[in-house]
Amino acid sequence: MKIDQAAVAGTLESGDVMIRIAPLDTQDIDLQINSSVEKQFGDAIRATILDVLARYNVRGVQLNVDDKGALDCILRARLEALLARASGIPALPWEDRQ
């Protein structure tokens, strides 16, 4: 999936997450996480984000994640909404997930 534009999904409310994405000129993934529960769940948050990006074959992006204690299912939903917005498609290609 190609990320064409910057986008935002989520809120800064307790129990939610705000994620910002922007395309990069390289194939790297620049991931910055700021979380109120990073000490306890930082590795799990990072793993979830990288899993979703890998499922949709996303590379060459900068992600800024401001987590306020979001559950894994919320994090995944926000990421999928973000990818749809940033790629300019109306819905994710569910059948193409790896």
Curated annotation (Swiss-Prot):
Q: Which HAMAP family match?
A: CitD
**How would you summarize the oligomeric state and partners of this protein?**
Oligomer with a subunit composition of (alpha,beta,gamma)6.
GO CC annotations on file:
cytoplasm
Positions carrying O-(phosphoribosyl dephospho-coenzyme A)serine: S14
Q: Where in the cell is it found?
A: Cytoplasm
Species the sequence originates in: Citrobacter koseri (strain ATCC BAA-895 / CDC 4225-83 / SGSC4696)
Give yes or no: UniProt keyword Phosphoprotein.
yes
Q: Which domain of life is it from?
A: Bacteria
The cysteines covalently paired via disulfide bonds are none
Q: Which family does it belong to?
A: Belongs to the CitD family.
The identity of this protein, by name, is Citrate lyase acyl carrier protein
Q: What are the UniProt keywords, alphabetically?
A: Cytoplasm, Phosphoprotein
Task performed by this protein: Covalent carrier of the coenzyme of citrate lyase.
